[in-house]
Amino acid sequence: MSNVRVSNGSPSLERMDARQAEHPKPSACRNLFGPVDHEELTRDLEKHCRDMEEASQRKWNFDFQNHKPLEGKYEWQEVEKGSLPEFYYRPPRPPKGACKVPAQESQDVSGSRPAAPLIGAPANSEDTHLVDPKTDPSDSQTGLAEQCAGIRKRPATDDSSTQNKRANRTEENVSDGSPNAGSVEQTPKKPGLRRRQT
């Protein structure tokens, strides 16, 4: 440290150490509007939620809390599940980070073992409305993580002769006496007509 030079414009190291000890720098995360009253915040949120619920109840004459229709301008009717479009009762999409298990294949992409069904996905599409939404999310997350570990995005090909999109061959390789030298087509190049710009 004896070779370190401090410029005249900067404060000396002793002064900086003393300043830091006397007045610690306040944290960057400051409360600009005073302390937060959590009870008041909770009351305001509950009041806002009640107001929204009452407004939607008046608008749609439906009690969303008890799942019952109310008297009003709309007439609610109970319908059979089969008469509804499929997107009303199909299972929800898995989260973006979750892996996808192919539905029509009975084995995984490497062909070694049967693919396990998705955690939380119902076995029968008819029973999707009966799925218990109170499953433990930590269990399903670990199950998905274990499931996704061995599955590849792109399946392994059995054909060992993979071909590049563009054949990167030079004229020397084409003029070789190799048996597959003429099998790759080459795009003819335009003769170079370059003009000088002045």
Swiss-Prot record:
Protein function: Important regulator of cell cycle progression. Inhibits the kinase activity of CDK2 bound to cyclin A, but has little inhibitory activity on CDK2 bound to SPDYA. Involved in G1 arrest. Potent inhibitor of cyclin E- and cyclin A-CDK2 complexes. Forms a complex with cyclin type D-CDK4 complexes and is involved in the assembly, stability, and modulation of CCND1-CDK4 complex activation. Acts either as an inhibitor or an activator of cyclin type D-CDK4 complexes depending on its phosphorylation state and/or stoichometry.
Keyword Nuclease annotated: no
Name of the protein described by the UniProt record: Cyclin-dependent kinase inhibitor 1B
Note: Decreased levels of p27Kip1, mainly due to proteasomal degradation, are found in various epithelial tumors originating from lung, breast, colon, ovary, esophagus, thyroid and prostate.
Disease per UniProt entry: Multiple endocrine neoplasia 4: Multiple endocrine neoplasia (MEN) syndromes are inherited cancer syndromes of the thyroid. MEN4 is a MEN-like syndrome with a phenotypic overlap of both MEN1 and MEN2.
Native species: Homo sapiens (Human)
Effect listed in the UniProt record for changing Y74F: No change in binding CDK4 and no inhibition of CDK4 activity. Translocates to nucleus. No effect on in vitro phosphorylation of CDK4 by CCNH-CDK7
Location of region: Disordered: 1-34, 85-198
Consequence of changing Y89F: No effect on binding CDK2 complexes, reduced CDK4 binding and greatly inhibits CDK4 enzyme activity. No nuclear translocation. Inhibits in vitro phosphorylation of CDK4 by CCNH-CDK7. Completely abolishes CDK4 binding
Expression across tissues: Expressed in kidney (at protein level). Expressed in all tissues tested. Highest levels in skeletal muscle, lowest in liver and kidney.
Motif (Nuclear localization signal): 153-169
UniProt cross-references to Gene3D superfamilies, sorted A to Z: p27 (4.10.365.10)
PANTHER family to which the protein is assigned, alphabetical: CYCLIN-DEPENDENT KINASE INHIBITOR 1 (PTHR10265), CYCLIN-DEPENDENT KINASE INHIBITOR 1B (PTHR10265:SF9)
Spans annotated as Interaction with CDK2: 51-91
